[in-house]
């Protein structure tokens, strides 16, 4: 019996404010379809699309701008399983396998979460410590791992 999981390819962005590196504030947004769930922008990679192209497309779709510069990317793809209540909605996928990018908003870029298909109803730029306090869901371990990596490399 085969027990291999079916993961959806996905990109995620840790978006730093345009004041980086002078100030390290990270964008986090509150999902409009779940109660008090804050997360980084993320989304699926379309068939034939590169991870970087998906990154820019997803940022435009979710936060209204793709005016960012890539600072770094996490060296591995990270996977997680969907919790029970989400797995039904995301069928046939059991979870996601993600490529994380650290990006900085370009000067003059404007965030607009009132997009064509809004996924968020609020957002903030916060410190790393605040990120860890705000994340209370199944992706927390991955968020901690990725942020710690970028901290160790001296990016944040």
Swiss-Prot record:
Cofactor(s) needed: a divalent metal cation
Residue ranges annotated as transmembrane are: none
Q: What does this protein do?
A: Accelerates the degradation of transcripts by removing pyrophosphate from the 5'-end of triphosphorylated RNA, leading to a more labile monophosphorylated state that can stimulate subsequent ribonuclease cleavage.
Q: What's the protein here called?
A: RNA pyrophosphohydrolase
| Short sequence motif Nudix box: positions | 43-64
Which SUPFAM superfamilies has this protein been placed in?
Answer: Nudix
Q: Which family does it belong to?
A: Belongs to the Nudix hydrolase family. RppH subfamily.
Native organism: Campylobacter jejuni subsp. doylei (strain ATCC BAA-1458 / RM4099 / 269.97)
Taxonomically, what lineage is the organism? Bacteria, Pseudomonadati, Campylobacterota, Epsilonproteobacteria, Campylobacterales
Q: Which GO biological process annotations does it have?
A: nucleoside phosphate metabolic process; ribose phosphate metabolic process
User: Which InterPro entries does this one have?
Assistant: Nudix_hydrolase (IPR020476), NUDIX_hydrolase-like_dom_sf (IPR015797), NUDIX_hydrolase_CS (IPR020084), NUDIX_hydrolase_dom (IPR000086), RppH (IPR022927)
* Domain Nudix hydrolase: from-to ranges: 6-148
Q: Which Pfam families match?
A: NUDIX
Q: What class of enzyme is it?
A: hydrolase
Q: Which GO terms describe its molecular function?
A: bis(5'-adenosyl)-pentaphosphatase activity; guanosine-3',5'-bis(diphosphate) 3'-diphosphatase activity
Q: In its keyword annotation, does this UniProt entry include Hydrolase? A: yes
The UniProt record lists the EC number as 3.6.1.-
**Keyword list, A-Z:** Hydrolase
